[in-house]
Amino acid sequence: MNIPRLPFVTCRFTLTGLNLERFMNTLQKEGVPLLSARRADRRTLECACYLRDLPRVRQLAGEKGWRVTRERP
């Protein structure tokens, strides 16, 4: 069953690590949309995604060496 992505069920998070552009490209290849992404500094992105995609974001980040922190709805 394919769960729809509802626009009001989103989550914001902070991502830290090196080569953040690669993270965004990895998400795109995996079909995980980012609703917004803003660079806070050289090694930090502040992002938003659909809540249903957050577990996949965490999994990809962990596999590739990035850290997802400050998760909030």
Q: Could you describe each region identified by the protein language model?
A:
Residues 1-73:
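Immediate N-terminus of the mature polypeptide
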